[in-house]
Amino acid sequence: MSNPFDLLGNDVEDADVVVLPPKEIVKSNTSSKKADVPPPSADPSKARKNRPRPSGNEGAIRDKTAGRRNNRSKDVTDSATTKKSNTRRATDRHSRTGKTDTKKKVNQGWGDDKKELSAEKEAQADAAAEIAEDAAEAEDAGKPKTAQLSLQDYLNQQANNQFNKVPEAKKVELDAERIETAEKEAYVPATKVKNVKSKQLKTKEYLEFDATFVESNTRKNFGDRNNNSRNNFNNRRGGRGARKGNNTANATNSANTVQKNRNIDVSNLPSLA
């Protein structure tokens, strides 16, 4: 069997010929899907420096150095007893303004020595005078005091007492004319006399009449009442021929609209005479 590939020539490879590797052609991906490629590492130089940092509770939560575990891992360099948190100067209560009070201000605020001495001397003198007055009053109180009065002076004193005074009678003037003129005396006389009209009271008028009451007839005539009611009903409707155009009954009844009930007994009605 003949080989048809012999017509193409010698297929033996030449050892001197350099065979180039095939070039891989990569097609550009236009898909919007995320590729399975790890994200690039953050560049700290490109980070925004003016970015506001969280504060408050959010800052405490994001602080990675805070926490009990991190604090326990740190070494305590100084003891809490050796270092004082509040270090103040020995002259903390002293004024550092450099201003001092004058002697006049000191004397006005705390008192002058000379004035204090004079005030003490005056107080001692007042105390000695009060002691002398108290001693004199005690001596006078020790001596008995007797009031001597004569009998006439005692009687006059009792008579002048307000409880022993005799009430004086009221003086009454007996001149009747003088009293009458004093009552009629008027500073401004009336120019016009007003006439007062007296109104008469209205009297009530009573109407008297005798009324007699009699028991009504207990027996009722139902037959007449039924007949009258039927007649009245026929008169109002115009009878059986009213629907057919017979208005003769209505014409006769319209002339006499008031009908007298003859079944009423007049003797049973009360009399107004």
From Swiss-Prot:
Residues 258-273 have a biased composition (Polar residues). The keyword Hydrolase does not apply. InterPro entries: HABP4_PAIRBP1-bd (IPR006861), STM1-like_N (IPR019084). GO terms for cellular component: cytoplasm; nucleus; perinuclear region of cytoplasm. The keyword Phosphoprotein applies. One of its GO terms (biological process) is negative regulation of apoptotic process. GO terms for molecular function: DNA binding; ribosome binding; RNA binding; telomeric DNA binding; translation elongation factor binding; translation repressor activity; triplex DNA binding. Phosphorylation by TORC1 upon nutrient replenishment inhibits STM1 and causes its release from dormant ribosomes. Residues 1-153, 219-273 are annotated as: Disordered. Its main location: cytoplasm. Coiled coil: none annotated. The modification N-acetylserine is found at S2. It comes from the Eukaryota. Residues 224-236, 244-257 have a biased composition (Low complexity). It is found in: Cytoplasm; Nucleus; Cytoplasm, Perinuclear region. Keywords: Acetylation, Cytoplasm, DNA-binding, Isopeptide bond, Nucleus, Phosphoprotein, Translation regulation, Ubl conjugation. The modification Phosphoserine is found at S32, S41, S45, S55, S73, S118, S229. Residues 60-77, 89-104, 111-124 have a biased composition (Basic and acidic residues). There is a cross-link at K46, K121, K171, K184 (Glycyl lysine isopeptide (Lys-Gly) (interchain with G-Cter in ubiquitin)). The modification Phosphothreonine is found at T181, T218. Associates with mature 80S ribosomes. Binds to the head domain of the 40S ribosomal subunit and prevents mRNA binding by inserting its alpha-helix domain towards the mRNA entry tunnel at the decoding site, where it blocks the binding of tRNA and mRNA at the A- and P-sites. Interacts with EFT1; interaction sequesters EFT1 at the A-site of the ribosome, thereby blocking the interaction sites of the mRNA-tRNA complex, promoting ribosome stabilization and hibernation. Interacts with CDC13. Associates with the telomere-proximal Y' element. Belongs to the SERBP1-HABP4 family. Present with 46842 molecules/cell in log phase SD medium. Ribosome preservation factor that protect a small pool of nontranslating, vacant ribosomes in cells under nutrient starvation conditions. Under nutrient-limiting conditions, cells reduce ribosome biogenesis and degrade ribosomes via autophagy (ribophagy) or proteasomal degradation. To avoid excessive degradation during starvation, STM1 binds to and protects 80S ribosomes from proteasomal degradation. Under nutrient-sufficient conditions, TORC1 phosphorylates and inhibits STM1 to prevent formation of dormant 80S ribosomes. This is Suppressor protein STM1.
